[in-house]
């Protein structure tokens, strides 16, 4: 019985701590959500532009190398 409790007790403690964490968490309000969404969108746009310019630079370089 001790061996069974040795495996069950950490799981029980984890579930108890997880439930406590979820109860303490709160949903972001509308203003906070919009701020996070805007920051994420700006990040995506910046990464897209960086990828576009890298591709734009590598196309002529690739044509020079392959065209030779």
Swiss-Prot record:
Q: Which segments sit on the Cytoplasmic face?
A: 1-32
Biological process annotations from GO: post-translational protein targeting to membrane, translocation; protein targeting to ER
Which parts of the chain does the record assign to the membrane side Extracellular? 62-68
Where is the protein found, in the record's own terms?
Endoplasmic reticulum membrane
Q: What does this protein do?
A: Component of SEC61 channel-forming translocon complex that mediates transport of signal peptide-containing precursor polypeptides across the endoplasmic reticulum (ER). Forms a ribosome receptor and a gated pore in the ER membrane, both functions required for cotranslational translocation of nascent polypeptides.
The scientific name of the source species is Xenopus laevis (African clawed frog)
Q: How does it assemble?
A: The SEC61 channel-forming translocon complex consists of channel-forming core components SEC61A1, SEC61B and SEC61G and different auxiliary components such as SEC62 and SEC63. The SEC61 channel associates with the multi-pass translocon (MPT) complex.
Annotated keywords: Endoplasmic reticulum, Membrane, Protein transport, Translocation, Transmembrane, Transmembrane helix, Transport
The record, for InterPro entries, names: Prot_translocase_SecE_dom_sf, Translocase_Sec61-g, Translocase_SecE/Sec61-g
Kindly give the Gene3D superfamilies that the UniProt entry links to this protein.
Preprotein translocase SecE subunit
Main localization is endoplasmic reticulum
Q: Name one GO cellular component term.
A: Ssh1 translocon complex
* TM annotation in the entry: 33-61
Query: Which Pfam families does this one have?
Result: SecE
The answer to whether the entry has keyword Nucleotide-binding is: no
Q: Tell me its family.
A: Belongs to the SecE/SEC61-gamma family.
Q: How does it sit in the membrane?
A: Single-pass membrane protein
Q: Species lineage, top-down?
A: Eukaryota, Metazoa, Chordata, Craniata, Vertebrata
Q: What is this protein called?
A: Protein transport protein Sec61 subunit gamma
User: Where would one find coiled-coil regions in this protein?
Assistant: none
- GO molecular function terms listed in the Swiss-Prot or TrEMBL record: protein transmembrane transporter activity; ribosome binding
């Amino acid at each position: 019985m001790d061996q069974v409790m040795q495996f069950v007790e950490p799981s029980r403690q984890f579930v108890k701590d997880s439930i406590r964490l979820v109860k303490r968490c709160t949903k972001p309000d509308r203003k906070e959500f919009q701020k996070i969404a805007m920051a994420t969108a700006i990040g995506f746009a910046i990464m897209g532009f960086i990828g576009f310019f890298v591709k734009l630079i590598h196309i002529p370089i690739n044509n020079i190398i392959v065209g030779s």
